Amino acid sequence: MKKNRLNLNGVVVINKAKDISSNKVLQQLKYLFNAQKAGHTGTLDPMATGVLPICFGRATKIAQYLLDADKEYIATIRLGIETDSGDAEGEIIAKSINIPELSAEYLEIVLAKFSGDVVQIPPMYSALKYNGQPLYKLAREGKTVEVKSRNIKIYELELLEFNIDSLKIRVKCSKGTYIRSLAIDIGKTLGCGGHLIALQRTQSGPFKLSEAFRLEQLKDLSFEQKIASITNIESVFIDKPIYSLLEEEKNDLYKRGLFADKPHLDGTVRIYDVEKFVAIAEFDKGKLINKKFFDQDILISE
């Protein structure tokens, strides 16, 4: 007989290990916590490691906010070899011995071309769909289709180290950025090709690697310690401004929706009733256009 599953609410930040899929991490965590409902916030490739927030219960309603959040990565690029997938798991499709002589000054000039607003073409080996079919399935069948480019933003691109045939970079970027595509494009710009050989996500939205748990750590915890590892829903929005409801605004917010003119507010805000976080709201030029209600104090609900 199966144990009754717990209706947990909140987020557990996982430090994903290499060679495990994001979905397998999700299923293992759901089993470890005996959770009724869980979902992740965007996949990491099996070869990638690092920050993978897992949402439980009511927190799954705000998973999209983490999907849309900025990310930070540490990436290592191998030069002189191209693969069909753009990473070390793919088949080699080209080799070059014409790797230029690298220097910090030269690489900084090259990397500067990829900072700011960038137009990027996602790789064929991705979960994006073409006529309803995931691109990676078409790629595995040997098919190639024209993939639409997308506008992304790279806020920070820092050279960490390099040697004669590789470089390591730190990338802070917007949603929708493919680090494999960045590795491919950097290799092309250097004139020798390249592919991604290591990737670690160090931050996803407000969640940093330093606060993430390895699955092995969680397996050794008591039930109480596991529950303590769940961070509340407000933590997802900890960098967002707070709007405290006035007494006369409460009925409008809870019943009809608050449409008051708030010219100083734009984007996502945290709504407080007295001293308690009760909702998130989207303001567009001071007008409330969307809201979601929470009771962040309830980690385990009926």
Swiss-Prot record:
Keywords from the UniProt entry: Isomerase, tRNA processing
GO terms, molecular function: RNA binding; tRNA pseudouridine(55) synthase activity
Catalytic residues (positions): 45
Pfam family, one: TruB_N
Matching SUPFAM superfamilies: Pseudouridine synthase
Coiled coil: none
Catalytic reaction equation(s): uridine(55) in tRNA = pseudouridine(55) in tRNA
GO biological process, one term: mRNA pseudouridine synthesis
Role description: Responsible for synthesis of pseudouridine from uracil-55 in the psi GC loop of transfer RNAs.
Family: Belongs to the pseudouridine synthase TruB family. Type 1 subfamily.
The protein's name: tRNA pseudouridine synthase B
Organism of this sequence: Francisella tularensis subsp. holarctica (strain LVS)
Name of encoding gene: truB
